[in-house]
Amino acid sequence: LKECVAIDSDAHRLVRVEENLARLNHHATLICAEAQEVEGWHNGELFDRILLDAPCSATGVIRRHPDIRWLRQASDIAPLVAIQAQLLQQMWQILKPGGKLLYATCSIFPEENAQQIQAFIEQHPEAEIIALPPELHSVSTATNAIGLQILPGNGNMDGFYYALLHKPSQS
């Protein structure tokens, strides 16, 4: 790994990231910014790999935070889906040809997960879905052609969704 860049809009989260990196004897460039406002933080260099831990409804953490059931409303989902789509589009633009983008949420809603990735692929037919490692499938409850969904409690984990995309090299 040549360089790692972490972007978060919450300075307090970045402090925790910095503490964890120091504990593990790793280094990263930490940037406090809105990731979707690329022009404000991006230096023009394309990334080989991107982990997009997208803002989401956090419905996957319901077993540890049961109050989320009352804190979330149906009207919360559409704005989150729009932000996720914007982030996917912008991160795809700064991903190098031949690069990989891992999209992740802690949501259990298809609109934020497989449907989001399906819509992205329809707009970017060049994007290739890469199968995730088989060992992850043991905790998954919904493995399909579009990512992997872990439901809360499976493997004593929170709920998560992952989809790995590859941006083909230009020929």
Where does each model-flagged region fall?
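S-adenosylmethionine
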Residues: L1-S171
